[in-house]
């Protein structure tokens, strides 16, 4: 593998990268940064946590000038990812004014700060709000980044994304980064990019370091098994994935009731609550994060040793995204799948698509826990509110 010094970065940027504690570029960084520095359009396919932000961040730090207005726009599907990208960019280039723009918070402070921004990291809904209010000037933008492009499609944001792209002048440099690239992402690239360079680096997880197992268990014992394993498996940080907000809250509430320190994150929480949750988990103040795919996607979290699939995802690609959060940087990782009758079809699709070596484990002796229910009325009203405001709040 090459060194950062070998891929044409400026000394000031090399120093910033050194301060981040990074010594060697990841595969996506070493293959994409040279083309990005040359001003080429790039399509990058790489797993979450593989270093995509640093890759396009080097281009922004090289090409964007301080005190020259808004010159770069990064679109992200979630608020949390917008904040994470902003944090990395500010460390790479402290001279630039980098701003995160997303819904769920007051818009007036954003209007005030946009005047001085050189780089904006935004979710599509709130950025469209600013465009409609004419509180953001796009005429000087020369670099556009679409981060987690596949998730933009999955979350129904792509029409908003296309509206935004059409407001950005040409010529410009356009970068698309995505965990997976399919026909829909390629079609989007054809409409908005010029002779893009394709780079792929999907293997962040070391298969020799990753153990995948499953338990076949009745649905009414699934929570008891999860609690037993969390209390008896030696682990670092743990992520427990559920398919719905309701299950996420149900699992978190019952873990805490059974003396497992856990915290939940999903799209129904306020921005302040989500930010606090991520901070607590990243700081290891709480060892177990219960989450949905949408809420966790794009979050960069180190030192995750165990992934539990309380619910098996319907889309096999989501399974790959989940397990890609462990067995990184030479560390061991373990994926534990809890299968009831409701999960068998999803599990079969995953095995058919990827043919992983997932070993069956024998169910241990379990003491069945008494579960606490989630109040139905509160969740029903929250779901209705989310359906009504989903796009704009993102």
Enumerate the predicted regions with their spans.
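Intrinsically disordered, Lys/Arg-rich low-complexity segments
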Residues: 365-394
């Amino acid at each position: 593998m090459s060194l950062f010094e070998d891929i044409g970065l400026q000394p000031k940027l090399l120093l910033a990268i050194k301060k981040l504690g990074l010594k060697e570029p990841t595969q996506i960084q070493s293959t994409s940064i040279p083309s990005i520095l040359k001003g080429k359009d790039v399509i990058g396919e790489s797993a979450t946590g593989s270093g995509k932000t640093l890759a396009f961040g080097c281009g922004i730090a090289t090409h964007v000038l301080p005190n020259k207005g808004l010159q770069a726009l990064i679109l992200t599907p979630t608020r949390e990812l917008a904040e994470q990208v902003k944090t990395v960019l500010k460390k790479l280039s402290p001279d630039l004014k980098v701003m995160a723009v997303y819904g769920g918070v007051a818009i007036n402070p954003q209007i005030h700060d946009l005047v001085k921004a050189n780089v904006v990291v935004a979710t599509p809904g709130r950025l469209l709000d600013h465009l409609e209010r004419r509180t953001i000037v796009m005429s000087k933008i020369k670099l556009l980044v679409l981060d987690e492009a596949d998730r933009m499609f999955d979350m129904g944001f792509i029409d908003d994304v296309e509206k935004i792209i059409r407001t950005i002048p040409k010529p410009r440099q356009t970068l698309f980064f995505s965990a997976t690239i399919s026909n829909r992402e390629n079609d989007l690239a054809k409409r908005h990019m010029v002779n893009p360079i394709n780079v792929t680096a999907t293997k962040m997880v070391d298969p020799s370091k990753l153990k995948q197992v499953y338990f076949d268990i009745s649905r009414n014992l699934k929570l008891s098994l999860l609690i037993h394993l969390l209390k008896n498996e030696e682990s670092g940080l743990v992520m427990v994935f559920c398919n719905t907000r309701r299950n996420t809250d149900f699992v978190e509430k019952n873990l805490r009731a059974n003396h497992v320190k856990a915290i939940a994150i999903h799209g129904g929480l306020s921005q302040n609550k989500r930010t606090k949750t991520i901070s607590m988990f990243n700081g290891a103040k709480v060892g177990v994060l219960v989450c949905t795919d949408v809420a966790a996607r794009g979050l960069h979290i180190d030192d995750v040793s165990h992934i539990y699939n309380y619910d098996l995802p319907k889309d096999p690609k989501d399974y790959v995204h989940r397990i890609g959060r462990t067995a990184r940087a030479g560390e061991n990782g373990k994926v534990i799948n809890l299968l009831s009758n409701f999960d068998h079809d999803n599990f079969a699709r995953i095995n058919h698509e990827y043919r992983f070596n997932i070993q069956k484990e024998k169910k241990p002796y379990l003491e069945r826990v008494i579960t606490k229910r989630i109040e139905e009325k509160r969740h029903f009203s929250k779901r209705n509110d989310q359906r009504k405001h989903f796009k704009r709040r993102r």
